[in-house]
């Protein structure tokens, strides 16, 4: 998903 990708960066 997209949110998961962002959460990984954070």
Curated annotation (Swiss-Prot):
Tissue: Expressed by the venom gland.
Effect of residue 1 to A: Decrease in antimicrobial activity, but no change in hemolytic activity
Lineage: Eukaryota, Metazoa, Ecdysozoa, Arthropoda, Hexapoda
Outcome following mutation: residue 5 to A/I/L: Increase in antimicrobial activity and gain in hemolytic activity
Effect of residue 5 to K: Decrease in antimicrobial activity, but no change in hemolytic activity. In R5K/T8W; In R5K/T8W; Increase in antimicrobial activity and gain in hemolytic activity (EC(50)=130 uM)
Impact upon substituting residue 8 to A/F/I/L: Increase in antimicrobial activity and gain in hemolytic activity
UniProt KW Secreted keyword: yes
Outcome following mutation: residue 9 to A: Decrease in antimicrobial activity, but no change in hemolytic activity
Gene Ontology biological process terms, A to Z: defense response to bacterium; defense response to fungus; killing of cells of another organism
GO cellular component, one term: extracellular region
Task performed by this protein: Antimicrobial peptide that exhibits broad-spectrum antimicrobial activity against both Gram-positive and Gram-negative bacteria. Also shows antifungal activities. Exhibits potent activity in stimulating degranulation from rat peritoneal mast cells but not from RBL-2H3 cells. Has little or no hemolytic activity towards human erythrocytes.
Impact after mutating residue 7 to A: Increase in antimicrobial activity and gain in hemolytic activity
Leucine amide sites (modified residues): 10
Protein localization: Secreted
Keyword Ion transport attributed: no
Modified how: The C-terminal amidation is crucial for activity, since the carboxylated peptide has antimicrobial and mast cell degranulation activities drastically reduced compared to amidated peptide. However, the carboxylated peptide has no hemolytic activity, like the amidated peptide.
Keywords, comma-separated and alphabetical: Amidation, Antibiotic, Antimicrobial, Fungicide, Secreted
Oligomeric and partner information: A n-merization is probable.
Annotated protein name in UniProt: Anoplin
């Amino acid at each position: 998903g997209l949110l998961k990708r962002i959460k990984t960066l954070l």
